[in-house]
UniProtKB/Swiss-Prot annotation:
GO terms for molecular function: 5S rRNA binding; structural constituent of ribosome. Part of the 50S ribosomal subunit. Contacts the 5S and 23S rRNAs. This is Large ribosomal subunit protein uL18. Belongs to the universal ribosomal protein uL18 family. This is one of the proteins that bind and probably mediate the attachment of the 5S RNA into the large ribosomal subunit, where it forms part of the central protuberance. One of its GO terms (biological process) is ribosomal large subunit assembly. GO terms for cellular component: cytosolic large ribosomal subunit. The keyword RNA-binding applies.
Length: 203
């Protein structure tokens, strides 16, 4: 282990790989709310957070579990289509709370072009949230709608039905044919839009 008079022990969250303090300071200096996006293997979470000397405050949040509970999502919650839908949801929630703009905070996630964290950003922007970005970082519509998943499911079903049923068992148990994922995506997207832009939302 490094030692000596000039050695400084990093902050605990830096040592644990949870916080990049240099990047965090840059985000805080903007003075804008942060659109914080985090992902695990099976889920995504998005929050609008503002800095407070006593501790960050969460203004609104959304979790992919809400897609299942409130909008009937039957697909996997760790993929690109669900990430986009989560972004759409957090974007509408932010607008409903009077939040018009934010800056993206993906923490220690690598900024890979077309990744699911940027699918969340795409959804939030489509909902009307103003977040500085370059359009080149977004996944294309083919991946956002889950066309790649549907095509893979079709190929796998034709080549090895047993493997197909193992890999897509979660879809099948819920009554969703993975080949119909793009259509299902559009249905859930429409439900989210209807909730926030429909007649009931304006009353």
């Amino acid at each position: 282990m490094a030692h000596g008079p000039r050695y400084r022990v990093p902050f605990r969250r830096r040592r644990e790989g949870k916080t990049n303090y240099r990047k965090r300071l840059k985000l805080l200096k903007s003075g804008k709310p942060r659109l914080v996006v985090r992902k695990s293997l099976n889920h995504h979470i998005a929050q609008i957070i503002v800095y407070d000397p006593k501790g960050d405050r969460t203004l609104v949040s959304a979790h992919t579990r809400e897609l299942i509970r409130d909008f009937g999502w039957k697909g996997h919650c760790g993929n690109t289509p669900s990430a986009y839908l989560l972004g759409l949801l957090i974007g509408y929630k932010a607008k409903q709370a009077g939040i018009e703009e934010a800056i993206l905070d993906i923490g220690l996630h690598p900024p890979v072009r077309g990744s699911s964290v940027f699918a969340v950003l795409k959804g939030a922007v489509d909902a009307g949230l103003n977040v500085p970005h370059s359009p080149e970082i977004f996944p294309d519509e083919y991946r956002i709608r889950g066309e790649h998943i549907a095509e893979y499911a079709k190929m796998l079903k034709e080549q090895d039905e047993e493997k197909f049923r193992r890999q897509f068992g979660g879809y099948l148990v819920k009554g969703l044919d993975p080949e119909k994922l793009p259509e299902h995506f559009e249905e859930v997207k429409a439900r989210i839009i209807e909730k926030f832009e429909g007649e009931g939302a304006r009353e």
